[in-house]
């Protein structure tokens, strides 16, 4: 598993294809409420700090460092090729990304949000060590989860 900052044009087109084939709900599930369907390359261009995920040199997805607040990094927009889910690749990619982030000396925690209906993603996050710290109910129920450096 390899994670590299940035995304090339071919891989942007893969993200657009995977997403638009799955539909509007799938886009919202990984990109949030502010993404417009159908997804376009220009929307991906507007996402800062995107990282490409590769498995055996094959592009399989993306993940984003959304923002840094003090000693915390908030992550999101985590997407694995839908044809490859259920094979443990998401877990491996997420663990690799967590390791990459925690190598930064001034980072002590990672947070993310996950919609209530995205049960599989929430289970994955809990499996790798995230825990729920807050629940927001408006406009849709979502969980804020955290992982602290050194915790599991």
Regions found by a protein language model. Name each.
Residues 91, 116-134:
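Conserved active-site alpha-helix within GNAT-family acetyltransferase domains
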Residues 112-122, 138-143, 148:
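Conserved beta-strand-loop-alpha-helix junction that forms the acyl-donor binding cleft
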Residues 85, 94-102, 126:
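A conserved short alpha-helix in the GNAT/GCN5 acetyltransferase fold that borders
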Residues 54-56, 147-150:
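Active-site beta-strand termini and strand-to-loop segments that position acidic
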Residues 2-83, 100, 104, 136:
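Acetyl-CoA-dependent GNAT
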């Amino acid at each position: 598993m390899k994670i590299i900052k940035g995304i090339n044009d071919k891989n942007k087109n893969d993200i657009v294809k995977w997403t638009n084939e799955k539909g509007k709900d799938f886009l919202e599930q990984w990109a949030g409420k502010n993404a417009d369907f159908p997804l376009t390359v220009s929307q991906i261009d507007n996402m800062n700090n995107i990282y490409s995920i590769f498995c055996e040199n094959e592009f399989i997805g993306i993940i984003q460092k959304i923002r840094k607040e003090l000693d915390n990094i908030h992550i999101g927009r985590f997407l694995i090729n839908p044809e490859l889910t259920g094979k443990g690749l998401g877990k491996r990619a997420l663990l690799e990304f967590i390791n990459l982030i925690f190598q930064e000396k001034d980072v002590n925690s990672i947070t993310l949000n996950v919609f209530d209906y995205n049960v599989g993603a929430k289970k994955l996050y809990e499996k790798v060590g995230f825990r729920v710290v807050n629940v927001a109910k408006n406009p849709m129920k979502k969980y804020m989860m955290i992982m602290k450096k050194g915790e599991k």
